[in-house]
A protein has these predicted regions:
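Extended alpha-helical scaffold and adjacent linker segments that couple domains
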Residues: 1-392
Length: 392
């Protein structure tokens, strides 16, 4: 028998199918198993299988990010709800970020912020974004293809479409597990850019995007995102009444409008990107309660009509954020308190021209006309004059 015939018989023995009707073949060496994986890896397309598996990996990666109310993976803007929830948007791989080419990522951010389907987005100030790094994206895609290839081999062995010996079957399973473990780390290294829409000047309609790198070497993704958001005040978890007062003073309190609705202010914070982004409504409620307990920040009331504040309070923390709560400019609140504490009628009014025997009058009545356009200045002046009389 020739050498060729012997080799032919040996190859048929090694690679022979278990039965004449069967199609699977046995692999004889590890090199053949590796080669099969490399061949299968080329079957998977970026826009189909690779993209789908990438979404699954990222879903696991951000599943523990409890800092946000919701997370969205590759979700178009019309499918992202337009409400008060704080949301993390994971941008699609084609919306990658590169220091020298940021346009694709920035366009993705601004598209979500501005639009909700065919309509304009109302709650624009509730979105933070996570973008992939262009340099690591190729590595992530290749790692996904390897994982898909090993998974297809393991699945074919399970369904008997591919026959391997026990050693090779175990090897395929171990390779799949090792690749999946590596895949999580590569995905975190790839999605390492936190993007935040910015509007520094409310009179300028143009929006910009600030970029913050995430440390992917040590901390978990959820803790790193939370730390970057808090440290850079992208999302505020505790707000001082000082900052609340300054925002109201800068944008809302006017000479002819010394009070502003707390609920309306919260609605504006959800909408306008130039205002601070609070984590939730409770943060504003806590700031209001702290501020209401002092005389330095604002007074509160529930209705303003006929130049009177119904339910007026100053230095009283017993308030609740609802549709009726008004926050009053502190100087106006002090002047209003002083004026109304002096015009309270006595329990037993004395006849005109007389006073109780041996006592000094303690109740005074009076009125003054104040120009509505300069009400703030006028009320402060009246209060100062009254205090000066009492102190004399």
């Amino acid at each position: 028998m020739s050498s060729f015939d012997k080799l032919h018989i040996k190859s048929k023995t090694v690679l022979a199918p278990p039965s004449a009707a069967a199609t699977p073949y046995r692999f004889d060496t590890r090199a053949n198993l590796r080669q099969e994986m490399e061949e299968r890896k080329q079957r998977f397309e970026d826009k189909k299988e690779v993209r789908g598996h990438m979404a699954e990996v990222l879903k696991k990666l951000v599943s523990n990010v409890a800092f946000f109310d919701n997370t969205h993976i590759f979700t178009p803007h019309h499918d992202v709800p337009d409400d008060s929830s704080l949301r993390l948007i994971v941008l699609a791989p084609e919306q990658f970020y590169l220091r020298t080419e940021s346009r694709l990522a920035f366009d993705g951010v601004l598209d979500h912020v501005r639009n909700h389907g065919a309509k304009s987005r109302y709650h624009s100030n509730r979105l933070i974004f996570l973008a992939p790094d262009h340099g690591v994206l190729t590595q992530l895609r290749d790692c996904i293809r390897i994982a898909l290839a090993w998974n297809s081999i393991v699945e074919d062995v399970r369904t008997m479409r591919l026959v391997l010996d026990n050693l090779q079957t175990q090897q395929a399973k171990e390779e799949l597990q090792a690749t999946e473990d590596v895949l999580q780390r590569v995905a975190q290294e790839c999605y390492k850019w936190l993007l935040c829409p910015v509007q520094n000047n409310p009179t300028v309609a143009k929006l910009t995007v600030d970029v913050f790198p995430l440390n992917t070497s040590g901390a978990t993704l959820e803790s790193e995102i939370e730390q970057v958001c808090i440290n850079n005040e992208l999302v505020i978890t505790a707000w001082s009444p000082i900052h609340l007062r300054e925002e109201l003073k800068k944008r809302y309190w006017k000479d002819n409008k010394p009070a502003f609705g707390a609920k309306a202010f919260w609605d504006d914070m959800l909408r306008y990107i130039y205002l601070p982004r609070l984590k939730n409504r409770s943060v504003l409620e806590q700031a209001i309660v702290k501020g209401a307990s002092s005389r330095d920040f604002f007074g509160t009331a529930y209705v303003y009509h006929d130049k009177k504040f119904d339910g007026f309070k100053l230095c009283d923390a017993n308030v609740q954020l609802d549709d009726t709560l008004l926050l009053i400019e502190p100087d106006i609140a002090k002047a209003y308190e002083a004026a109304h504490s002096l015009v309270t009628p006595s329990a037993e009014p004395t006849p005109p021209g007389s006073s109780p025997s041996g006592s000094t009058p303690r109740t005074f009545h009076g009125s003054v006309a104040i120009n509505a356009s300069t009400a703030k200045i006028g009320m402060v002046q009246v209060a100062e004059e009254i205090i000066a009389v009492l102190a004399a």
